């Protein structure tokens, strides 16, 4: 009896890839005044790849039978990419009436690499397991008229606490914080976190933060790199 299994693997974000299908960035910015943006999808594997693309507004790892409806159009929605070749994926906003104009919006770009199934399987592929790999990447829709993104961290405040700290993001941007250290340069975060625009979050810490402590914070910029800023705990 011949058995073929198709398994799905999910990744919230990817910073490195084995040979296979991968985009040219780990995150994308869609300015409101742009007609569209593009992502270059490359196939570094030895086999042709069949790839499906879509956007979703949440961070769910579930793969549903019906794709979510979004105000964006992706062209093409599915493509075949030969080994060593690439595909330009075009993302275009069709209707912005439902998107907030006073803050950045987060969408997830899904790239599903579907392995081809041989019609005449060999002995090597008999009873084999095939993996369809879904990778997810952040896409930020950025309305015109927002304050300078480079000054967003200046609008983040940190309130002292014993087991957790309160972080207020008064900026209209998403801010991903990967590390917070005190004067002794020891990491106090259990894990990285992303601040929603104009939000307040309670973040667990490994040690107490007292009022007046100088914090050194690492956050991810538009290019996927880590940059630091400082703040004083209130």
Tell me what each language-model feature is.
Residues 63-97, 185-212:
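Intrinsically disordered, low-complexity Pro/Gly/Ser/Thr-rich segments with frequent PxxP/GP/PP motifs
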Residues 41-45, 165-171:
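Asparagine-centered strand-capping/turn motif at beta-strand->loop junctions
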Residues 58-68, 177-181:
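Short, basic/aromatic beta-hairpin or loop at an interaction surface
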Residues 95-146, 212-234:
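Terminal connector regions
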Residues 2-10:
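Sec-dependent signal peptide recognition
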Residues 47-55, 175-180:
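Short, hydrophobic/aromatic beta-strand segments
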Residues 13-15:
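N-terminal signal peptide c-region/cleavage motif recognized by signal peptidases
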Residues 18-42, 148-160, 192:
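Beta-sheet-dominated interaction scaffolds and their linkers
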């Amino acid at each position: 009896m011949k058995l073929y299994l198709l398994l799905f693997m999910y990744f919230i974000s990817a910073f490195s890839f084995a040979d296979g299908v991968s985009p040219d960035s780990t995150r994308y910015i869609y300015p409101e005044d742009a007609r569209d943006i593009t992502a270059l999808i490359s196939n570094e594997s030895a086999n042709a790849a069949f790839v499906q693309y879509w956007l979703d507004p949440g961070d769910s790892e579930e793969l549903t039978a019906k794709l979510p409806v979004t105000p964006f159009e992706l062209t093409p929605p599915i493509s075949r990419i030969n080994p060593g070749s690439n595909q330009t994926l075009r993302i275009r906003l069709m209707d912005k009436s439902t998107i907030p104009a006073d803050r950045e919006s987060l969408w997830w770009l899904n790239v599903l690499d579907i392995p081809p199934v041989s019609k005449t399987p060999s002995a090597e592929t008999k009873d084999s397991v095939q993996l369809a790999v879904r990778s997810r990447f952040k896409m930020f829709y950025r309305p015109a008229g927002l304050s300078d993104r480079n000054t967003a961290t200046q609008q983040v405040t940190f309130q002292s606490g014993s087991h957790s700290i309160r972080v207020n993001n008064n900026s209209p941007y998403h801010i991903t914080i990967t590390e917070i250290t005190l004067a002794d340069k020891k990491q106090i975060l259990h894990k990285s976190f992303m601040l929603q625009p104009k939000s307040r979050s309670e973040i667990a810490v490994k040690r107490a933060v007292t009022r007046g402590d100088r914090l050194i914070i690492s956050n991810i910029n538009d290019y996927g790199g880590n940059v630091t800023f400082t703040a004083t705990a209130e």
